[in-house]
Amino acid sequence: MSAHGDRLYFRQFLSGRDFGVADQLAQQMVNFVYAIGDRQTGECVLVDPAYDPAALVDAVAADGMRVVGALASHYHADHIGGSIFGHDIAGIAQLLEHADVPIHVQADEVPWIERSAGVGSGHLMAHASGDVLAVGELTIELIHTPGHTPGSQCFLVHDPAGGKLVSGDTLFLDGCGRTDLPGSDPAQMLASLRRLHRVPDEVVLYPGHRYSPADSAPMAAVKANNWVFDQI
């Protein structure tokens, strides 16, 4: 049973603006972190909690929510912590210092996350595509969308109001994730985009970076305006 619309807790945080304000890399990378939960039970999960996990835990606590897990869209350091461009980024390893919670990852991404984020498999909960995670009475479907990385995944939040798709670096409002990085695969990306093209039009897309003036858009608009769907 999905949480009713008034129970859904959903917050979008922009790195360098809403947290990590003094972090120049956080400002440059414009990552989005999401908090998704059930207001009635007070449980929530964080999607891609990088840069300042403690601040994110505090932010949701101020809303009366407690973190019961984290979701990793993929292994890159700007999403889950690690080293990038010669900088060390806090992430899921530091989150575990503040909240001893499971980190939900796609099974194919486990070895990449272990290497990049410094978190052992004992803290990682591996999932297959189609798995459904319950947060209170809210349900989140985990969708394997390889291409940017082998175990990239998107999160479909079931909501009577129409649903939300948190897409990490698989799909942006304009464009898609790069396919020229370690573990990337252009053919898999095309297959993943075809899969996401089947997401209902009324679902709202929430990407992993603010690469467009808007922070989100209905899938109908994304399908109509994003050039990546011209080849679908």
Where are the regions that the model predicts?
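Core dinuclear metal-dependent hydrolase active-site scaffold
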Residues: Q12-D18, Y34-A35, G130-P160
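Active-site-proximal loop/helix segment associated with metal-binding centers of metalloenzymes
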Residues: Q12-V33, Q40, E114-G122, D174-G175, ...
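Metallo-beta-lactamase
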Residues: M65, R115-V119, E141-H144, T149-I232
